[in-house]
């Protein structure tokens, strides 16, 4: 009898475990044994790699080895002063890499070629392209933001996206992309991460981070997950001040650290440490995680077992810039590469002086320099690269690129609500009213596609409509059996008075061709029945796909990546 009770008890526990896991979120990981990332794992026994690294090390002075640990930012401009700055950091300070930011891709390529020509050791060219090249460079493909991509259920598409971004980076001579953002954005008031995150579910964020990063690295570009140990639940911008993460270790393990652990276990090669105060890990008040040995060496390297390249976040940011000898502190904390120092001459000299005083050993500098060189070899930098300038725009903006952008946009469309099964609409109903909340021509692709199924009658909602005009418009709409509200306007305050009294006795379908956070600006819920579709953008192909979804000739598989107030929870979606 006791055995029967025991079996019953075990059975109940087995049933409850998935429920408990779903409620509590990701379970903490146990420490994992360190292992080199996939990108360099085979190089430990590669004779040619070792010979190349040895040959470079032999000809570098101590100061030049220190220089290899710096990445300096350069504007992609062709003016004389900018070119002289480029020459100085490459020839005088022997930096290990460059970060270009903003401008035209043609200028970036010309400066990249010039810098590589001047460099004694090939430069690691880095880029901050969280949603592709368009984040920084004009005339490049504009992919959706991460929070939109977080709605996509097919992670193979995210991997494909990573491969494509890697291809474009290589076309520009870029070997490192400071992406993806691995922060779990569970604070809707976050002023800096927000749509840069894949969402608020640690599971979903982790899956997207791994898929995208693998795509990058399989395409020959180092991924750098950021901002360790997690910048998602803050209401302070680390560009302006030092955010505090006042959480327990158990909370950090289950939410903030979860995507980073998954990235490490997947064998991904780069991590960026953010400027964050984490009292439960580093008790020294005001010390940023990027300068904390307990965070970098203790948590990231020893506890989580990360053996890849550790980058600081930009050292010119306000979240860290008040500290003395920033670069020296960052190296002592365990970082490998120092990103965007304010005063490179003074910082290089400070590190050199510290080595001579014994605060850092030559052995530590040598180990970091060898590590950087090994990654350079893995990224094809054993020889100086040269980027072909002619045909650059055509190579970046290809038909395959445009097709991928289309598929990503369509896969993110999410039916948030379908109360009383309003959708799909029945074509036999006849005319439908279409209320256009935006510019007159903005929804023409939608209307054209809609006309394949029904006869749409368009009404345009003016801003700050007088009460009498609003009543007439509401009465006109009420004559139709179905109303489609198409929203392309981002600033919706001028329309709120109209919707406050919008309660028709017929079904209404709200179509938001704007970012999800704008949905709450319009009152919904008072119609006889409702459906809500979040399309994220007014892209022409997206508009056509939404029309197909409305009439059931296409389906939507998207799921909301981050809650929209209390109206729609993360994970919401109807197929």
Task: Give the label of every model feature segment.
Residues 1-31, 37:
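Bacterial Sec-dependent N-terminal signal peptides
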Residues 71-80, 147-159, 241-255, 316-320:
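Active-site mouth loops of central-metabolism enzymes
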Residues 87-103, 188-189, 264-287, 478-490:
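Short acidic, glycine-rich surface-loop motifs adjacent to enzyme active sites
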Residues 75-78, 125-135, 175-185, 225-231, ...:
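Short glycine-enriched loops at secondary-structure junctions
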Residues 22-72, 76-89, 302, 323-575:
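Preference for extracellular/luminal or secreted protein segments
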Residues 78-91, 158-165, 253-260, 322-327:
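Short, acidic/polar
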Residues 105-122, 155-171, 365, 370, ...:
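Active-site-adjacent structural elements in enzyme catalytic domains
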Residues 61, 98, 108-123, 133-135, ...:
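Second-shell residues forming the walls of enzyme active-site clefts
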């Amino acid at each position: 009898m006791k055995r029967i009770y025991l079996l019953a008890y075990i059975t109940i526990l087995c049933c409850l475990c998935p429920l408990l896991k779903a409620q509590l979120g990701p379970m903490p990981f146990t420490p994992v044994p360190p292992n080199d990332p996939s990108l360099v794992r085979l190089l430990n026994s590669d004779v040619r790699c070792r010979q190349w690294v040895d040959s470079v090390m032999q000809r570098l002075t101590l100061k030049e080895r220190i220089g290899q640990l710096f990445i300096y930012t350069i504007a992609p401009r062709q003016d004389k002063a900018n070119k002289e700055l480029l020459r100085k950091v490459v020839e005088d300070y022997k930096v290990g890499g460059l970060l270009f930011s903003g401008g035209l891709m043609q200028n970036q390529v010309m400066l990249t070629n010039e810098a590589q020509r001047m460099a004694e050791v090939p430069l690691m060219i880095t880029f901050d392209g969280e949603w592709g090249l368009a984040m920084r460079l004009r005339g490049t493909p504009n992919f959706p933001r991460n929070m939109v991509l977080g709605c996509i259920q097919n992670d193979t598409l995210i991997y494909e996206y990573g491969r494509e971004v890697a291809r474009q980076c290589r076309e520009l001579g870029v070997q490192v992309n400071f992406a993806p953002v691995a922060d779990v954005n569970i604070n809707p008031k976050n002023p800096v991460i927000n749509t840069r995150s894949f969402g608020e579910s640690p599971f979903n964020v982790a899956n997207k981070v791994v898929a995208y990063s693998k795509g990058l690295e399989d395409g020959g570009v180092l991924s750098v997950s950021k901002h360790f140990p997690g910048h998602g639940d803050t209401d302070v911008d680390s560009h302006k001040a030092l955010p505090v993460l006042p959480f327990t270790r158990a909370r950090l393990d289950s939410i903030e650290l979860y995507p980073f652990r998954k990235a490490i276990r997947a064998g991904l090669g780069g991590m960026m440490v953010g400027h964050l105060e984490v009292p439960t890990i580093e008790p020294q008040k005001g010390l940023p995680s990027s300068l904390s040995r307990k965070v970098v060496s203790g948590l990231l390297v020893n506890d989580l077992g990360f053996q890849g390249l550790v980058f600081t976040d930009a050292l010119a940011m306000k979240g860290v810039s008040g500290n003395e000898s920033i670069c020296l502190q960052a190296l002592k904390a365990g970082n490998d590469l120092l990103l965007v120092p304010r005063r490179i001459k003074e910082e290089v000299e400070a590190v050199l002086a510290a080595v001579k005083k014994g605060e850092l050993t030559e052995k530590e500098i040598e180990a970091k320099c060898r590590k950087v060189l090994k990654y350079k070899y893995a990224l094809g930098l054993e020889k100086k690269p040269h980027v072909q300038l002619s045909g650059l725009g055509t190579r970046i903006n290809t038909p395959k690129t445009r097709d991928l952008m289309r598929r990503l946009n369509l896969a993110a469309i999410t039916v948030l609500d379908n109360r009383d099964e309003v959708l799909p609409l029945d074509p036999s109903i006849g005319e439908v009213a279409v209320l256009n909340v935006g510019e007159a021509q903005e929804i023409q692709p939608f209307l054209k596609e809609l006309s394949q199924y029904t006869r749409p009658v368009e009404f345009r909602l003016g801003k700050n409509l007088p009460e009498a005009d609003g009543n007439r418009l509401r009465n006109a709409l009420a004559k139709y059996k179905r109303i489609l509200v198409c929203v392309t306007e981002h600033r919706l305050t001028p329309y709120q008075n109209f919707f406050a009294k919008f309660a028709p006795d017929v079904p209404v379908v709200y179509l938001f061709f704007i970012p999800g956070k704008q949905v709450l600006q319009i009152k919904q819920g008072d119609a006889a029945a409702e459906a809500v579709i979040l399309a994220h953008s007014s892209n022409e192909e997206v508009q056509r796909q939404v029309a197909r979804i409305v009439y059931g000739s296409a389906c939507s598989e998207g799921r909301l990546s981050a809650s929209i107030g209390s109206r729609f929870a993360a994970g919401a979606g109807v197929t």
